């Protein structure tokens, strides 16, 4: 397996990342365990998940993928062998069951802390190596919407710094 530095960190990640979004919906916990075992045995040390998973997102499977990964960490005692990436969900129609509801989702400090704390609990770990914004909170030119309006009051990055460094 080939490895690369993750950005400017000292973390060496495999060039192949295991995507886990189907664990808990299309794949059972045992399927997930088998896939993670297989990947790790072949040198894949980079796993990607999100609070929103399993896909297709539904209330009944919300956070299920992170729970399966957490169960695997607990059973295999191998958290230190994995570079783990997860993501926070943001405003999106149909996500009323995440935190306080889709209209209140965002990248503010309250939401970010709540999302991280819940992910850590599901993942049965005390750290996430790479934490990402899953979907932009701002309007983006997607699905035929071509206009982008810059919002100079957007403080997402400031919030991320506050959460990370406090």
Language model regions located:
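Charge-rich, low-complexity amphipathic helices
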Residues: 35, 54, 61-62, 91, ...
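Intrinsically disordered, low-complexity sequence elements enriched in Ser/Thr/Gly/Pro
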Residues: 2-3, 85, 120, 130
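N-terminal binding-site loop/beta-alpha segment at the start of enzyme catalytic domains
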Residues: 1-83, 126, 155
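Glycine/proline-rich, positively charged
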Residues: 96-166
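N-terminal small/glycine-rich loop or linker at the start of catalytic domains
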Residues: 7-26, 85-103, 132-135, 139-141
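A short linear-motif detector with a strong N-terminal bias
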Residues: 61-65, 93, 109-112
């Amino acid at each position: 397996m080939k490895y690369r530095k993750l950005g400017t960190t000292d973390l060496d990640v495999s060039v192949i990342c295991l995507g886990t979004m189907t664990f808990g919906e299309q794949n059972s916990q045992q399927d997930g365990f088998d896939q993670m075992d297989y990947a790790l045995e072949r040198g894949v040390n980079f796993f990607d998940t999100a609070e929103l998973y399993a896909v297709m997102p539904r209330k009944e499977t919300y956070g299920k993928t992170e729970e399966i990964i957490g169960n695997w960490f607990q059973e295999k005692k191998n958290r230190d062998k994995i570079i783990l990436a997860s993501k926070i969900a943001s405003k999106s129609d149909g996500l009323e069951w995440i935190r306080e509801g889709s209209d209140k989702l965002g990248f503010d400090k309250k939401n970010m802390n709540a999302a991280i704390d819940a992910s850590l609990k599901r993942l049965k770990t005390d750290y996430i190596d790479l934490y990402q914004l899953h979907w932009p909170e701002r309007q983006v030119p997607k699905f035929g919407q071509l206009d982008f309006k810059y919002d100079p009051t957007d403080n997402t990055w400031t919030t991320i710094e506050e959460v990370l460094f406090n």
